[in-house]
């Protein structure tokens, strides 16, 4: 698969994307200035692959501006709590394997 990391999206960048991962603090409650922000504009949502999955690392608050935008444009969205859970599960699997093999 082809992976592309970008700092700034061009107008039509999301037309061919299958997944968009928000790794910015925009939408989070880390600072007041981030809270009501989104990494994507309404114009970008109008030029987006309708089958894209948007994965947001933000999990506080649970509902962000990005999540509402996705809902309004019928875009699949997963918030940061799920990503955090996936990471915790993977870490648990790794550490469990280490402990099982420790005494051998």
Q: How would you name each of these model-derived features?
A:
Residues 2-77:
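Rossmann-like adenosine-cofactor binding region
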Residues 59-62, 75-99:
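Active-site capping/gating segments
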Residues 102-104:
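A short, charged, Gly/Pro-tolerant segment at domain boundaries
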